[in-house]
Amino acid sequence: GAGKSTLLKILGNIIPIEAGTRELGLNVSVGYFSQQRVDVLDMERSVLDEATDGIESSITEQKARGILGAFLFRGDDVFKKVRVLSGGEKSRLALVKLLLDPPNLLLLDEPTTHLDMPSIDAFIEALKNYTGTILFVSHDVHFIRAIAKTTIQIEAGKVTPYAGDYD
C-alpha cells in the first residue's frame, strides 16, 4: 500500500534508505517488532533464556517470569523450547524481549496480528506502562483506541496527522 511498513523499517534501520536521510534524536534507542521478525528468536533456547538473552541491565529471574506471566507464559511454560511454540506464542515472546529491555522508541508493525484477545490485552497493559515513544501501524481498532494519542493517515503519498485515537 501506502508505505507505512516501509517507513517503520526505514526508521528501525531494517532496510536501507534509497534517497534522503534517516535522522533520529541524540541517544534514541530503537526497538522494532513485526510478526515477520520472530525469525530472530533462537529456537533451541528455553522461553526464559531467550527472553533474557542480551539484556544489558541486570534483571532478576522473578521480574522476567513476571513479565512472561503477563504474556501468558506461566509455570513450566518458561522452560519450553522456542521451537515448539506456536506463531502467536513466538510473537508474544518477541514482544516480551522488547519490553524486558525497552528502547526509548518502539516501532510496531501490525503487532497484534498473531495474538489472541488475552495476549492483546496483556500487551496493551504493558504498553500503557511504557515511558518511551511508540510509533505503530495497525488495523486493530481495539489496539488503536487503547494506545493511540495521535493518529497519522498515510494515503496517496500524503501524510495527515489527527489528534486522538481512531475515533
What label would you give each PLM region?
Residues 1-167:
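ABC ATP-binding cassette signature C-motif
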